Amino acid sequence: MYKIAVLPGDGIGPEIVPEAVKVLEAVSRRVGIEFQFTEALVGGAAIDARGIALPPETLELCRQSDAVLLGAVGGPKWDTLPPAERPETAALLPLRKELGLYANLRPAFLYDSLVEASPLKKEIVTGTDLIIVRELTGGLYFGAKKREQTAEGEMAYDTMYYTRAEIERIVRLAFTIARQRRCHLTSVDKANVLTTSRLWRDTVEDIKGEFPEVTVEHMYVDNCAMQLVRRPAQFDVIVTENTFGDILSDQASVLTGSIGMLPSASIGGAVALYEPCHGSAPDIAGQQKANPLATILSAAMMLKYSFKMDQAAAAIEAAVGRVLAKGYRTPDLYVPGTQLVGTAEMGQLVRRELEEG
């Protein structure tokens, strides 16, 4: 039996997460493995009920679970709070830290039936199937920072630093993932300017001998941003530091036609966190307009990376593909000639395909 902490969160979270849970229940029946789901508060919902974005009991539940499934946190309701107390900061960052999650995995895979939904031309975007491995615990976001008045006027600074050990663990993970895919790794840095990037590049060079079957290329981050829209199918696995990864993964998210299609995993410790890449979308919350597929695909990543159930994960991905191929679309993907469905109906369609497939 696997224990899964379920954190719906805010906005559309309580609508999309149950659909992923139901898909996992269908997997459970299909393969005969039991999942135990335990729900808890996080984010703005936790602030409203408990006065804190990450209650101790939620954190303890996550620690005692085998994996965590998260919906989304945040929204305008809590934007008046001090930045350090807002759901996005006060829930996600400490949760990642406490669980020891140092790597974020963001796949960008374009289903054939969604090629026309991409903002890029068909001939450019066809064949896109990449994953960005982003370092989560170092870099600018966690370095020393300050804003102050000086004799010369107001100034501010942020500090970027990395240890070789931090780089080694994320790079080895990326090599391992590349070895399981198409054996091509692109390491993204800014080694022509940044000292941290030069250490990053040197570390990649030192480690690549451990993975002789993987082809490695180094690419400056500005060039990578250009190549992602010029020829995205050239990429297999991209590994990069925190800030660059944050930007590039959001850029890659538009390739698939909707951010509502993009899952993610944060891994590194004993317990991994799985969540869709999109936010809480409070403007459509409670209206059955949200796309649950990113959350369902995040559940598939859970099966693959936490439970080593690769075949079950592939079955979910294939079920999603068949639903899309039949023309069913949530509002974010809808175009004339397709069949408009709501959140729960889309989840039901995936479950039906999974059970019949």
UniProtKB/Swiss-Prot annotation:
GO terms for cellular component: cytosol. Transmembrane segments: none annotated. Pfam families: Iso_dh. The record marks 141, 190 as: Important for catalysis. The keyword Lipid metabolism does not apply. Pathway: Amino-acid biosynthesis; L-leucine biosynthesis; L-leucine from 3-methyl-2-oxobutanoate: step 3/4. Disulfide bonds: none annotated. Substrate binds at residues 96, 106, 134, 222. InterPro entries: IsoCit/isopropylmalate_DH_CS (IPR019818), IsoPropMal-DH-like_dom (IPR024084), Isopropylmalate_DH (IPR004429). Homodimer. Catalyzes the oxidation of 3-carboxy-2-hydroxy-4-methylpentanoate (3-isopropylmalate) to 3-carboxy-4-methyl-2-oxopentanoate. The product decarboxylates to 4-methyl-2 oxopentanoate. This is 3-isopropylmalate dehydrogenase. It comes from Moorella thermoacetica (strain ATCC 39073 / JCM 9320).
